[in-house]
Amino acid sequence: MRLFSNEQYCRIFELCNSKPKDKTWDDIAKQLNTEFGGLDVSSSCYRKCYQYYMLMNNALKAKGETAVATRILSISDTHVPFELPIDTLSDYKGRVDILQLNGDICDCQAISKFGKVYRVSPMEEIIKARKYVIDMIEYVQPKKVVVTYGNHDIRFQNYLAKNLDNEIAELMPKTSLELIFVDGFNHYNKREGTKSWYAPISQLFPYVKIDYADNWWTQIGDTIFAHPSAFSSGILKTAEKAMHFFRNEGLMFSELVMAHTHRVGEYYIGNTRIIEQGAFSDVSKNNYSNGQLYNSQKEGFVYLCQDINGKTIREKTELVALN
């Protein structure tokens, strides 16, 4: 059994690397034990962990390799109820430290402005999306889940704001993802006269940290994960515009992983790599642009590896196209 999680190991190396001269190893151990929830680990143990990592890292550097500290699996655009089977991720089972869900978990099909020949109940979508995410966490077994919202998720708030008085709309969250991950929700089945409570996912996995960003982007190490509402039909142009936006905002990053476009590709602009990660949904059933002569939608996802300093190891990145 491992004494520390990958995230804790990263914190150990970070603190030990920057250890001031006036701090002893006992001081470091006391600080880390407090941060890790009251552990009682000796300074000798922390020192040996750090020394072992440095030994392995130096050996890998001598071979021209870099030690992996954090493995990130980024999935976006599941568009429940059009999601792909979870066993599509079978090669990554047990190989993920952070599961990053990059928006558009729910399709919000019934409340979209697009024409539709049938409707899927928003409540049905939310219940199914919650179950899908639970199954994915159990299957992939990450240590942490980081969630951003997408333009389809934000339809929830926009629809309420358009169709309800402000006073009523203020009773509801911005997206259905808050209900799924943070707040939980009740389902009032009027036909059957039942009331069912669905606990938030954050309460179901005590050993998995759930981080709902409540934003359309987040940053992990040197990588920004984003799901904007803007769209450009040019190849990788949406990702390029996003890169310039974040640069203008003063953010420091080397990698940009973009959801939203349902395309798969990567490109280098200077020292920055931009990636469009594709959709983790069955695009044949979710064809918004049918007949509009856009490039066809692509299914895919991204698997990133970072070193102890949060720098992405590019040669170990996998951009996976599924169709």
PLM feature spans:
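Active-site neighborhood of phospho(di)ester-bond hydrolases with catalytic His/Asp-centered motifs
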Residues: 74-76, 98-104, 146-151, 225-228, ...
